[in-house]
Amino acid sequence: MIIFSVPVILSGILQLLFNACDIIVVGNFAGDASLAAVGSTSSLINLFTNLFIGLSVGSNVLIAHFVGSNDKSKVSLTVHTSIVLAIICGVFLSVAGFIFANPILKLMGSPDDVIMLATLYLKIYFLGMPALLIYNFGAAILRAVGNTKHPLYFLTISGVLNILLNLLLVICFSMGVAGVAIATVVSEYLSAALIIWYLSEKSEELKLTRSDLKIDPYILKRVIAIGIPAGLQGTIFSLSNVVIQSAINSFGSDVVAGNSATMNIEGFVYMAMNAIYQTAITFVGQNYGAGKKKRVLRCTLQAEAIVVIVGLFFGVSAYIFSTELLHIYSGSPAVVAAGKIRCAYILPIYFLCGSMDVMVGALRGIGQSVVPMVTSLIGACALRLVWISTVFKMHRTTGMLYISYPISWIITLIAHIAFFVYFYNKIPKEKE
């Protein structure tokens, strides 16, 4: 499990490094307003994309089940259906994001000195949605059969290109947020092209052929049955984050910029933990498909132990060096001070979020996707919205806003554990 996880962890960390380069270059060479513009769009981007990227979880779980039961024909059907689905959803997202970027940013109350730059960034960024979804679906397909190395290779190549284009477009051509967005879109299309090339030319068990690129209704139904709840769960979290971002916007551009920088630092910790979540889905899914009940439990417990260790190590380390890390993003004392407040509330206990996600992965691995979605709706989104409209309304500080995160993690984690125990006990004994 650890061997499987390492390339996924490295992929996640590399992805965040490249994203951090975007923010660092913008913050240092285009100003704090541009930094706030790029950072303030992350929750909105996640809101748009999580539903569709969640569908890739359906592909991952389904292929893992078919691999476990050695059903090669259905593996092939799932691969081709998934890629077509990624293209369709990507085009839809591009159009929707381009049209609704500015109205939603206004609805979120983005500061006046930020909104035009944020709109420009979003409109360019959303042109890369087809590529982003193709890469995510392709990587999910490869992970389902235990191949975590090639997505790492492709991400590295495209990420290096992203950094070079950032330096060229932002520093040399002074294109600001537009340059960062263009660099991101170009690198995303490169990673998508590489993963399509690998599936078409190099992979035998997941062979992608143009003539077979069509949607199989049965496979689509099953991918949606697992993927839509997974995507809705991500969207639910993003929706609550959009509401929180709107509240953060009310504190001004310095707090928005500091929050954005800290969220990027958090992203490194989260990506490391998210790799364990993805590992749990694959290992639990394959063992569930093969009827190995005891291994399902063993994989879940191992994943929980690993994610707590990883979350504590990276989270506490990031907190200890938070001042130095924040100075990389901005030299403004006000921005750094605002960022440190969020660091104190989130980073030392961020492992709780990872533990919660692993339980979600285990539930999805045994075919339960609706339950974690509903649990997250109540434990994350509803609780945070209630918190903002009651406690935060009475005590309007950023700290009172940020503490809603760990409270929601603890409550949701307890619920996920209870549901996993319930559904695990319902797995037939003859599958052992």
Tell where the protein language model's regions lie, with residue ranges:
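Transmembrane helical elements of multi-pass membrane transporters/channels
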Residues: 3-22, 124, 135, 158, ...
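Hydrophobic transmembrane alpha-helices of multi-pass small-molecule transporters
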Residues: 47-50, 162-166, 192-196, 268-271, ...
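Short alpha-helical transmembrane segments in multi-pass integral membrane proteins
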Residues: 1-5, 63-128, 172-228, 284-349, ...
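Short runs within selected transmembrane alpha-helices of multi-pass transporters and secretion channels
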Residues: 56, 125-143, 151-159, 180-193, ...
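Small-residue hotspots at the loop-to-helix junctions and early N-terminal turns
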Residues: 30-43, 118, 122, 181, ...
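Small-residue-rich hydrophobic transmembrane alpha-helices
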Residues: 35-95, 132-151, 245, 258-322, ...
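N-terminal transmembrane alpha-helices
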Residues: 1-29, 43-58, 62, 87-94, ...
